A protein has these predicted regions:
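A generic structural signal for beta-strand entry/edge sites
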Residues: 4, 52-56
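Active-site-flanking beta-strand signature of metal-NTP-handling nucleotidyl enzymes
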Residues: 4-10
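Short, charged/polar surface micro-motifs in flexible loops or helix N-caps
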Residues: 14-15, 54-55, 62-67
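Short amphipathic alpha-helical segments
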Residues: 17-42
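An amphipathic, aromatic/His-enriched active-site/gating alpha helix that lines ligand/cofactor pockets
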Residues: 41, 62-99
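Short beta-strand
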Residues: 46-51
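Short, low-order "capping/linker" segments at domain edges
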Residues: 94-114
Length: 114
């Protein structure tokens, strides 16, 4: 089984940095070991959407998400996160050390009458 999660994060509001961030996430640009690590953490699908300087991640995750990575996976994850840090700006509601903040679903068409 899997479930959908949505997370939010802001980017530094700088057009050049935003363009660089998008290039870093273009097909083939993300390090293969990062992609493997994402899957190893329990993500079965993931998309990142952007409007202005706001990012929204929509992901399907395994029921046991988030999974811990092995030492090698943690090292790669740490390097990737460090490479992305200068692009990203946590939301004001983020906790200490938190970047991607989970969002709460407030509406579902399938749950509506009619």
């Amino acid at each position: 089984m899997s479930r959908r999660v949505c997370l939010a994060l802001d980017l530094v509001d700088d057009a050049d940095l935003i363009a660089d961030y998008e290039r870093a996430h273009a097909p083939g640009a993300v390090w293969p070991e990062v992609t493997r690590g994402i899957r190893d953490k329990g993500f079965t699908d993931m998309e990142i959407w952007r409007v202005a300087d706001r990012l929204v991640m929509i992901a399907q995750v395994a029921d046991d998400w988030p999974r811990d990575l092995d030492a090698e996976g943690r090292a790669v994850d740490t390097r990737w996160e460090a490479a992305m840090d200068h692009f990203q700006r946590p939301l004001s509601c983020a906790g200490d050390g938190e970047k991607w903040v989970p969002m709460r679903r407030i509406y579902s068409l399938g749950e509506q009458a009619g």
